[in-house]
Amino acid sequence: MYIKQVIIQGFRSYRDQTIVDPFSSKHNVIVGRNGSGKSNFFYAIQFVLSDEFSHLRPEQRLALLHEGTGPRVISAFVEIIFDNSDNRLPIDKEEVSLRRVIGAKKDQYFLDKKMVTKNDVMNLLESAGFSRSNPYYIVKQGKINQMATAPDSQRLKLLREVAGTRVYDERKEESISLMKETEGKREKINELLKYIEERLHTLEEEKEELAQYQKWDKMRRALEYTIYNQELNETRAKLDELSAKRETSGEKSRQLRDAQQDARDKMEDIERQVRELKTKISAMKEEKEQLSAERQEQIKQRTKLELKAKDLQDELAGNSEQRKRLLKERQKLLEKIEEKQKELAETEPKFNSVKEKEERGIARLAQATQERTDLYAKQGRGSQFTSKEERDKWIKKELKSLDQAINDKKRQIAAIHKDLEDTEANKEKNLEQYNKLDQDLNEVKARVEELDRKYYEVKNKKDELQSERNYLWREENAEQQALAAKREDLEKKQQLLRAATGKAILNGIDSINKVLEHFRRKGINQHVQNGYHGIVMNNFECEPAFYTCVEVTAGNRLFYHIVDSDEVSTKILMEFNKMNLPGEVTFLPLNKLDVRDTAYPETNDAIPMISKLRYNPRFDKAFKHVFGKTLICRSMEVSTQLARAFTMDCITLEGDQVSHRGALTGGYYDTRKSRLELQKDVRKAEEELGELEAKLNENLRRNIERINNEIDQLMNQMQQIETQQRKFKASRDSILSEMKMLKEKRQQSEKTFMPKQRSLQSLEASLHAMESTRESLKAELGTDLLSQLSLEDQKRVDALNDEIRQLQQENRQLLNERIKLEGIITRVETYLNENLRKRLDQVEQELNELRETEGGTVLTATTSELEAINKRVKDTMARSEDLDNSIDKTEAGIKELQKSMERWKNMEKEHMDAINHDTKELEKMTNRQGMLLKKKEECMKKIRELGSLPQEAFEKYQTLSLKQLFRKLEQCNTELKKYSHVNKKALDQFVNFSEQKEKLIKRQEELDRGYKSIMELMNVLELRKYEAIQLTFKQVSKNFSEVFQKLVPGGKATLVMKKGDVEGSQSQDEGEGSGESERGSGSQSSVPSVDQFTGVGIRVSFTGKQGEMREMQQLSGGQKSLVALALIFAIQKCDPAPFYLFDEIDQALDAQHRKAVSDMIMELAVHAQFITTTFRPELLESADKFYGVKFRNKVSHIDVITAEMAKDFVEDDTTHG
């Protein structure tokens, strides 16, 4: 076993949690500067293991907590982990952790994370070899110097500690204390014996007179007994007579109470029936109100539908007339359009012919004009240009410009041609699209009509289901009211049961149910749920005739909880307390009940109570435990006899009870408050309530849920249809919008077609003129430059002038004619497009709209809905009439029940009056019985006061009359007066004092024997203490010599025991001392005393020569330290520990001796662990592991370091120390 690891937090200079790397099982060296925390590390281990820190005051605990920068430390702990692979600690683990935690108000030990006491820790350490008498397995800083300078007496004290004499001293002190106490008791007993002897002498003289007194007193008591006994017998006879009368009266009272209870039961039954009928009436009236509200709503809906149907019929009638009018108007419009189109067809050829002529004339006029202009220009170029070349140059330039202009004109003409062709193609495409859209429009209209029809079908079905649901809701409401009434009835019965049972018990039952519900909800402890079987009362049945006796027998045990095992009850109670639930509970664990079979008496006057109970055989133990030792008897007399004979509890059917111990209990028991009856009623009401709830859930609510689901489905269908309707109507509007747009496009295209044609003709005429000019210029190119036209050209000019004038005149005539025809065409087209055709479109649209409603879909749906609402109104009125009839019949039934209630009330009152009269008579008898019982008690008391009497006293005076008895009694009293001064207790006192004397003598002998035993024990303890010191001295002395020779080769050292009877200059070794001790003590006692020893001296020689042996005072400081170390090693060899902690033990040694100490530690480290601190390099050589302690920011840290780092630190510290 050794220290494997140390964990420190908050202790002295170690603030943060410091986990020291595991130690070697041999030699570990810790190095560090002064004040870095090495000693605090040793203090931490000592804090856990040593007695030095056992009883710390609060201020001492605070002093051990770390103080530094940062937040204040409020608690600290030191944990030591031991390697226990050798099982030196009696714990079956290879690693054992021991932790001590302190704070301002706490000081706790934890062994393997479990809290233990300080004594447990100390006992555990002692079992592992840590002796309280030898604390030298931890050697603190300065301890070596302290031992080196200690006097001889101090070393003797140390030797006594190592020898363990403290135990002997403690036992000796206890023995001395016990001996003093025994001596005091012996003196007291002697005083008492002296007093008793004197008192016995006095009582001997009083005994003679007492004998005469006792003779007459015996006679007096016999006479008084006879008188009292006669009075007692007379009183008993009268009591028996009264008991017989009371029994007869009690039977009559029972009959009257039974009759009264029957009347009350009938009244309660009638009240229940009246409540149920009133609840039924209330439900019917509420249903009637609901029906009335429904009927009002239905009538309102019917009125709306009737108005809507009428409006639709009127609308359809008006639509028919309008359609005829529109068709007639459309026909007229078509005729007018045809007429105008015919007129247009006649005018357009004329217009086109005139226009064509005009265009040809304009083109010819432009050509002739251009040709003339060219000829004039040709004439002018003679004066314009000076030479032919200049003119040709200009013509070429002009031709180039003309070619470009002609090309531009051709492109424009080609573009207009293409535009006209595209317009014609678009016109055809537009027409195709328009026809397609018209076809789609008809399909969409048909689909909208179909959706309208489907929508109204679904709506009608939904309305029918809603009507059915309303009926079911009314039914559910009626059932809910019946359920509420039944629940109210159950609550009343539960309240009665609560009133008859203790609040704590009922709270306990409720709390147990909460615990089980918690388990069920969490899905845990299934075996606990299965192992709980409810209270006793819920687990059996019996005939009502036995309710009273069963209930009286069980009492509150009726509410004990049956469980399979004590484990189940423990689990329930743990959760019960964890949830802080109220109430009290008592469990009957079947596995713990010890029930034995009972031998019941074979008699016709009694039966075992358990035979009249019906229960699950599984719970036989529980019921035998509660009822197994009880008999149901015919009468109280039988109960008394059987209880005495068979030591069993007996009870009558009326609840009068006789305990096997002799106690009698009984009296009137109110059966109306029977808890078994109440529990039966509660259970029955719960079953009825469960049936009603099941019916409500299985039938009505399931149907309502089904209808709700169907209505939701229909509502979803209606929403889907509405969505589709909106979609198709939007599609229809979109198609109409597209058709309108196409029509407008076509009209716009027709409007732009004619201007484009005219523009084309103008461009073509201009192109001809430009081509003519180009040809003229080309012809002129290369000709001679002339200032005058040639004759041919002049003729051509004249001819052109004539042609131009003629063409202008023709063109004016054609223009006038074209304008006239164009005006006619424009007027006709405008009338067609802006008037006739536009109106025709409007008429067509109105006809289409009329066609949408013309099918009567809405009217058909409205008519169907109206028929359905009429049927619902009729059904509602029929149901309302049925409810009126039912209400009348139910109210009549209530009146009959109320009459019956009055009759039963009168009967109950008659029985009550009879019971009251009987009760008064019974009270009189009870008062008389009470007086007789009092007299009986007085007689019995006086007889008891007479004390024990001889047998002759019971028979001697039985034949005498009361008069004679009183006469003899008077004579006895006269004689007794003569002995009034006699000590009547003289004989008793004499016997009593004699007995006390014997007891005291025995006690005195016991004390004498005890005193002798204590003296013997003290002698044995003194001898053992002497032997222990002698043995320890020999072992330590031997070890000291051996260790010193190893530390100082060639040296010699001995220990010397010093004694009190020897002069201070005289000292002897262990052997001589032993002989002197025995001789010195032999003159006084056979037991040698350790008090003769005064000290332990040390004599050493560092050279080995006998003549150079010196005392400790004669040695240098380093030699003293070495000797002290040798003594410590010797003590440790005598009482070895599993590990040792040395704090700077080599401080005062020179290098040679430090090396010897290091070698010694290396030798001892084979069998024990060493943890040492040093500032010298010698101890490092024998070490197996090295640790360095650093102090940063007022906090210590300890880490594993290498041997080289440890040597460097020691050398550096030695250099700069």
UniProtKB/Swiss-Prot annotation:
**Per the record, which residues fall in region Disordered?**
242-268, 1059-1090
**Which residues, renumbered to this chain, carry the PTM Phosphoserine?**
787, 886, 1013, 1065, 1067, 1074, 1083
- Residues folding into a coiled coil are 179-350, 393-503, 669-916, 958-989
Subunit composition and interactions: Forms a heterodimer with SMC1A or SMC1B in cohesin complexes. Cohesin complexes are composed of the SMC1 (SMC1A or SMC1B) and SMC3 heterodimer attached via their SMC hinge domain, RAD21 which link them, and one STAG protein (STAG1, STAG2 or STAG3), which interacts with RAD21. Also found in meiosis-specific cohesin complexes. Found in a complex with SMC1A, CDCA5 and RAD21, PDS5A/SCC-112 and PDS5B/APRIN. Interacts with PDS5A and WAPL; regulated by SMC3 acetylation.
Q: Which family does it belong to?
A: Belongs to the SMC family. SMC3 subfamily.
> What function does this protein fulfil?
Central component of cohesin, a complex required for chromosome cohesion during the cell cycle. The cohesin complex may form a large proteinaceous ring within which sister chromatids can be trapped. At anaphase, the complex is cleaved and dissociates from chromatin, allowing sister chromatids to segregate. Cohesion is coupled to DNA replication and is involved in DNA repair. The cohesin complex also plays an important role in spindle pole assembly during mitosis and in chromosomes movement.
State the name under which the record lists this protein: Structural maintenance of chromosomes protein 3
The species is Mus musculus (Mouse)
The opening ranks of the lineage are: Eukaryota, Metazoa, Chordata, Craniata, Vertebrata
